[in-house]
Amino acid sequence: MKENSVGLVKTKYVTFKDDFYFESGRILSPITVAYETYGKLNEKKDNAILICHALTGSAHAAGYNSPDDQKPGWWDDMIGPGKAFDTDKYFIICSNFLGSCYGTTGPASIDPSTGKPYGLKFPVFTVKDMVKLQKKLIDYLGIEKLLCVAGGSMGGMQALEWAVTFPEKTYSIIPIATAGRITPMAIAFNTIGRFAIMKDPNWMNGDYYGKTFPRDGLAIARMAGHITYMSDKSFHKKFGRRYATFGGIYDFFGYFEVENYLRYNGYKFTERFDANSYLYIIKAMDIFDLSYGYGSYEEAIGRIEADSLFITFTSDFLFPSYQTEEIVNIMKNHGKNPEWVNIESDYGHDAFLLEFDTQTSCIKEFLSKIYNKVANQ
C-alpha cells in the first residue's frame, strides 16, 4: 500500500425505501446508494466534505478495498493524511451517483416489480437528480451543512448544482475542470459514443443482460471519450507518430501506437462498466444546464452563496477555461468573490486526475481558510 494512504476501507450501502421523484416526473423506489467515508466526523459535524466523482468513477475514491488490490481509489493522491483533502482534519464522503453501475441503483439494477434489470425502463436522470440523492445520503449521515463539495469534470457539475439548488447546505465548493453546461463540441463527441453503442447489434435496445454484452459499441464510445480527455501536446508526448507493429506502414492491418492505446483502453473499459449506464450518464451530461428552472444562466449562478475555488487547466479540450471564466465573472457581477486558479498543464482534461501537487497547494490553503471561518462562527 502507498504511504499516507487511508488504508483499507469498506464500501457501505444504504437503501432509501421512500419514493424518489426525478426531475422528469418519474418516481422510483427503492434506491440504494453506495458510498465510502474517510477520516472522522467531529462533534459539531462541520468538517464534512463531499467528493463527487466523474462520468465513470465510483465511490471508491481513496484507499484499498482489499489487501490484494493492485491500485488504490481513483483520487488516492488527493485524499488521505496530510493530502489536499486531509483525513486527519476532515471527514470525507464519496458516493456512487445515481444511475451508475458501482453499487448505486441504475439501469443494470434489478427492478423489484419484474425481477429483471431495469434497462431502458430506468428513468432518464439529471445532475440535479444525482445531487438530490446525495442530499438524502448527507441527511442520513446526520450532517446539517457540508464544509465543502468538490469534484472534477462531471463531479464539478455536481458541486455547482449543490451550490445552486441547495445554497444553504454547503459552506464552500471546489469545481475542477468543469462547466455549468457543456459545449456543442462535447455533445458531438458524446453523440459518437451513443451512436456506437446503440448501433452495436448486441445492444438490443438495452435488453442485453444475461446475453452477449455490446462490447464493441462501448469500446468505441470509450475511445471517442479518451480523445477528449487528453491534449494535442499529451498525444505528441505519449505517442508521437510511432508505429506499433513490425509490418511497416504498408501493412494494411498495421497501426500507430495511439491506435493501440485507444483500442486497449476502450476494450479494457468494457470489463468494468455497463453500456446502458454509460448512455444514461452522457445523456445527463448533455442536458445539464444550470439555467434550467431559473430563467437565465446569470440568475442561476447568482444563487451561489458558497465560498468558491475554481480550478482549470490550460490544455483542457473538453472543458475549456473560458467556461469557468464566464462563471467567475457572473459571480463577481453579483458581488461574490470567487477564487480561480488556471493551472499550466499539458495533460488536457485528465489533468485533474494527474496534477496533484499544483492542486494540493491551492486546495489545502482554501479549505483551511474555510474551516477556520466556520469554526469561528
From Swiss-Prot:
InterPro entries: AB_hydrolase_1, AB_hydrolase_fold, HAT_MetX-like
Reactions catalysed according to its record: L-homoserine + acetyl-CoA = O-acetyl-L-homoserine + CoA
Active site: S153 (nucleophile), D316, H349
Pathway per the UniProt entry: Amino-acid biosynthesis; L-methionine biosynthesis via de novo pathway; O-acetyl-L-homoserine from L-homoserine: step 1/1
Span of domain AB hydrolase-1: 47-355
Gene Ontology cellular component terms for the protein in this record: cytoplasm
Gene Ontology BP annotations: homoserine metabolic process; methionine biosynthetic process
Keyword Protein transport found: no
Cellular localization per UniProt: Cytoplasm
EC number: 2.3.1.31
Binding site for substrate: R222, D350
GO MF entries: homoserine O-acetyltransferase activity
Top-tier EC class: transferase
Keywords from the named record: Acyltransferase, Amino-acid biosynthesis, Cytoplasm, Methionine biosynthesis, Transferase
Pfam families: Abhydrolase_1 (PF00561)
NCBIfam families in UniProt: homoserO_Ac_trn, PRK00175.1
Subunit structure: Homodimer.
PANTHER family the record matches: HOMOSERINE O-ACETYLTRANSFERASE (PTHR32268:SF11)
Family: Belongs to the AB hydrolase superfamily. MetX family.
Job description of the protein: Transfers an acetyl group from acetyl-CoA to L-homoserine, forming acetyl-L-homoserine.
Protein name stated in the entry: Homoserine O-acetyltransferase
